[in-house]
Amino acid sequence: MTPLDILILGASYGSLLATKIVLAGHNAKMICLPAEADLFNAEGAIIRTPVKGRDGLVEIRTSGLAGQLSAGGPADANPAEFDLIVLAMQEPQYSSPGVRDLLHSVAESCVPCMSIMNMPPLSFMKRLPNMNIDALRPCYAESNLWDAFNPEKFTLCSPDPQAFRPPEENLNVLQVRLPTNFKAAGFHHAEDNAMLRRLQADIEAVRFTTDDGDTIELPVKLKVHDSVFVPLAKWAMLVAGNYRCVQSAEMRPIQAAVHTDIDQSREIYNWVVDLCVSLGGAPADFVPFEKYANAAQSLGSPSSAARALAAGAKNIERVDKLVQTVAAQKGLQLASLNETVALVDGWLEKNRAAG
């Protein structure tokens, strides 16, 4: 079969999925900054990941793999030429010059589009039943950017694998901290789902030969689910962990956010899961708190949202506010979530006032 051609907007977190795609024999093009593109085109992507049963990290380089990896700027891609488009930037970045024009071209192309953002685009929220979309608009940096998309051609994939760029390394190096799976909701149309499930099967079939000659199965798969609620499993994790890294004076690691008061974390987490079930999800769509809390033990640094605020960011993804707003549509609120939203608002106001 002809390899799939997949366009990925964003090369930091996006390089992880891009590497899985290229390992499976398909082609990926990443849209990123010029310095990143030059590096990816010259050297490929380098992913370092823990593998169960092995000591240390396994290094995967995309150069020489079955598929082709390339990179360029927003003007270097025609979305209509691709089989699938993946959105892997932080939500406020889609407002930047060049990227917003490319996003509009993506919508106009009607090519199936899958978000691996923490913040589910408004186009996906339209697939959830009985959702007041206009009430959600203030949660987005620029909500009208998502209006041109056909929700039937749009889906969400939960970005569960935790990864970071080691600060001492080049921009094409990504280190996986928590090698869990990408969990995607299916598309509306059968032919789009067939393409997504083909990608899932090809990624699962990959066997990788290490430097010492061992043939191994790699973690971080793509799992496609029928339920549109499965990717929302990330909401409880973000609200109980990532956003609670934000404190009034400083940031704390995710591990501390979850484990300093484990009972409160459990209450928040289960409240968000219950909210998602009330929207139409099944309890089996979501991750039990104990499993999440155990994984959080290894997350010894603040979340990317918290780090961005501490570095002076004037906009970040607001999943905290989105969950608060969705809950309000159900007549629900949680004091600790309100407190978190207020803390994030305060940091953003301070950063914006600083100019």
Label for each model-derived stretch:
Residues 2, 168-180, 194, 198, ...:
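NAD(P)-dependent Rossmann-like dehydrogenase/reductase catalytic/cofactor-binding core
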Residues 17-18, 96-99, 124-126:
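Short glycine-/acidic-enriched loop or helix-start segments at secondary-structure transitions
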